[in-house]
Swiss-Prot record:
It comes from Mus musculus. InterPro entries: ATP-synt_VA_C, ATP-synth_a_Xtn, ATP_synth_asu-like_sf, ATPase_a/bsu_AS, ATPase_F1/V1/A1_a/bsu_N, ATPase_F1/V1/A1_a/bsu_N_sf, ATPase_F1/V1/A1_a/bsu_nucl-bd, ATPase_F1/V1_b/a_C. GO terms for biological process: ATP metabolic process; cellular response to increased oxygen levels; intracellular iron ion homeostasis; synaptic vesicle lumen acidification. It is a peripheral membrane protein. Its main location: cytoplasm. This is V-type proton ATPase catalytic subunit A.
Amino acid sequence: MDFSKLPKIRDEDKESTFGYVHGVSGPVVTACDMAGAAMYELVRVGHSELVGEIIRLEGDMATIQVYEETSGVSVGDPVLRTGKPLSVELGPGIMGAIFDGIQRPLSDISSQTQSIYIPRGVNVSALSRDIKWEFIPSKNLRVGSHITGGDIYGIVNENSLIKHKIMLPPRNRGSVTYIAPPGNYDASDVVLELEFEGVKEKFSMVQVWPVRQVRPVTEKLPANHPLLTGQRVLDALFPCVQGGTTAIPGAFGCGKTVISQSLSKYSNSDVIIYVGCGERGNEMSEVLRDFPELTMEVDGKVESIMKRTALVANTSNMPVAAREASIYTGITLSEYFRDMGYHVSMMADSTSRWAEALREISGRLAEMPADSGYPAYLGARLASFYERAGRVKCLGNPEREGSVSIVGAVSPPGGDFSDPVTSATLGIVQVFWGLDKKLAQRKHFPSVNWLISYSKYMRALDEYYDKHFTEFVPLRTKAKEILQEEEDLAEIVQLVGKASLAETDKITLEVAKLIKDDFLQQNGYTPYDRFCPFYKTVGMLSNMISFYDMARRAVETTAQSDNKITWSIIREHMGEILYKLSSMKFKDPVKDGEAKIKADYAQLLEDMQNAFRSLED
């Protein structure tokens, strides 16, 4: 929000509007003489005018959480009420920007103050007022038209990827008395004037919205389109939908951040909001360094991924209270782009740090601790955040659909999934990608454990798969069965060795190894494997399962005859086929293209059928 427009202590002539600091404990300040203040109202604390938010009222005493460092605040310092809730500015200029937890633009602050740290009490508006945007009004709007909340009345081409649709704020309506002609305007220029019941209102391209309030929609719709991540193990076995909620819990070093970054790089979303909430500063700087260099192809033109990304950075050394706000800031930005009709993905890395911030502030307020010292309302807060996801029909005209998908990384201490944050999250989200320390130690990445992970969206997506990839659902079921059987056989193998197993079981073990090493494992740092399109995923799985079926059939049909086929015979004769199966992943979707890869996989299937025929003859 625009902190420069909030009232200042020195401008205030009436002393009666001040409260006074009564006590300071870390980021929590208590103030007296605050009668008339509202819950979640923004205040300015002390002579440095630090931004804070009221989180508890008792008589005329208010408890305030301050979003900046409170050193130097003393008892008796003035506290000024602003009468506004914590809000964000929504308008052109969000994409490609990087904000802190309360939407202060970090690059603008650094260029104005020439400092690598954020000075205290800094006043900078979130969206720059110096940039002129080219505003194109809607064709069907003219003076006298009626317009209600959510209607799109103009378009700004923010960059070559994002058409920023300028919408009327949800609670306004009226008839148009003025609409700006096409031209260049900055974010504070009036582009629309409405009259409703004799009252005139002016609107610029920027709207302000309180972060703790959900943006209204016409109706919620069932999700039915997959969120393709480009990671085979996730797309094939545990799919998420556009508008779904996902948790990625895992111990340190399991690759949570790499998965959430690859989601932001390669997923089929239109807009990415990446909230780094209490994680290392290096991870945010890595995102800032990598994303501008990464490109995607849109209509034959190569575009930087940063053009569809906004970052909310709140690293572990920034004030704790702002960490709690950063999640709300991120989800409000996501809902705004959803209302334009885009599919938005929001990455929260990591919600555990956010819960720790809640725990710290709750401890300062001397509230009754629940499990592991977290506050009793932890589950409710998590739910209120995750429930803002979903696929919706947006308010206003023209009719459009949008969605917000939330992917929350959770880092339980010691990788223990019974930790309160993880268990509360799992009760809310629909998809669980559980990362396994043992797999990560074996350098099997992405280290998603296929036995404990699950997705509740399988049924919802069946219709989509039947339409586009008819053979996929039975393939997935078969692959899961093979992996499960392999897990059951592993115990027997440890006791009696591989040699004494039945021939069909040997095939199961070998194909499971093939699936694990050459299908589920994926190297995110190579050009051919960092992103795997869905047709390639289906093609690879199809050939592996076909090999399994043919090998089993060959063994079972010749079991009674004299020249029976065993697994060792298959392995001897099919060395080349097995090699080709395990090198299917080296086909580069960018260089080779879809048609060539599909043709190669079909050719491999034909070779396989011929090899089995000659073996049986």
